[in-house]
């Protein structure tokens, strides 16, 4: 295992323009060594139209073909290909929370094996979220937290850090 680098799995589906914005934020905010694993469904994905622009960031980037389709399968493939002791799953459309990556990694270094970002903690928010979606997300998360053994208060948020020790 490579324990001195963070791998960031980003499931993508025709996210080209968003990826460039996200990479700008990564460059500005992430203060630790990291590698990006872009997990895509199909070779026609528009991410490949942006490869030259991505090279300008000088990041360690690997493109991983999803053997199936959808974000769940893409994340699983990212985990199977990755080698780091610490992996973050980051939603490509989250242009707000990049700075939390450093904090989450520090929690990992201090012994945490799972770190889940939450929109329901102090300082968290669901900016721009339609009311009905907000109600559904909050209700589902509340129910899962109280009726299951999962100690996560924001079950539908895809932004998480995992230790390979699990």
Enumerate the predicted regions with their spans.
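Acceptor/aglycone-binding surface of glycosyltransferases and processive sugar-polymer synthases
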Residues: 66-81, 86-89, 98-166
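Cell-envelope/extracellular polymer assembly enzymes that use nucleotide-activated donors
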Residues: 5-7, 35
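A conserved acidic beta->alpha catalytic loop
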Residues: 40-49, 94
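A short helix-to-beta-strand connector/capping loop
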Residues: 57-61
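Short beta-strand/turn micro-motifs composed of small residues
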Residues: 10-12, 40
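Short beta-strand/loop segment that forms part of the nucleotide-sugar
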Residues: 23, 33-43, 64-65
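Donor nucleotide-sugar binding loop of glycosyltransferases
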Residues: 15-18, 43, 71, 97
